[in-house]
């Protein structure tokens, strides 16, 4: 498994809405993530700085990257773009993080 972590932002007035939209996520999005080898996906909110810290374990980079090309992922991005900074393709602005320590 490949462990990934990344940071995104949520608009200051949208913390509760962000959580509501993820409680639960669309079943078809959950299915696509699992079909593409995503496991143990978690998102944490730093409410003071409006940051979202995400971790996920994936089976391969290629399968993970392929999620972005699915119709359901593109609909999800469009659904979320009004409550978080987004790129021109509607994907959330995110910064991948480098792992510097892990204890199993």
Curated annotation (Swiss-Prot):
Keywords: Carbohydrate metabolism, Cytoplasm, Isomerase, Rhamnose metabolism. Pathway: Carbohydrate metabolism; L-rhamnose metabolism. The keyword Isomerase applies. The keyword Amino-acid biosynthesis does not apply. It catalyses: alpha-L-rhamnose = beta-L-rhamnose. It is found in: Cytoplasm. Its EC number is 5.1.3.32. It is an enzyme of class 5 (isomerase). It comes from the Bacteria. The active site is at 22 (proton donor). InterPro entries: Dimeric_a/b-barrel, L-rhamnose_mutarotase, Rham/fucose_mutarotase. Substrate binds at residues 18, 41, 76-77. Its main location: cytoplasm. It holds the Pfam family rhaM. GO terms for cellular component: cytoplasm. GO terms for molecular function: L-rhamnose mutarotase activity. GO terms for biological process: rhamnose catabolic process. NCBIfam families: YiiL_rotase (TIGR02625). Homodimer. Belongs to the rhamnose mutarotase family. Involved in the anomeric conversion of L-rhamnose. This is L-rhamnose mutarotase. It comes from Cronobacter sakazakii (strain ATCC BAA-894) (Enterobacter sakazakii). The gene is rhaM.
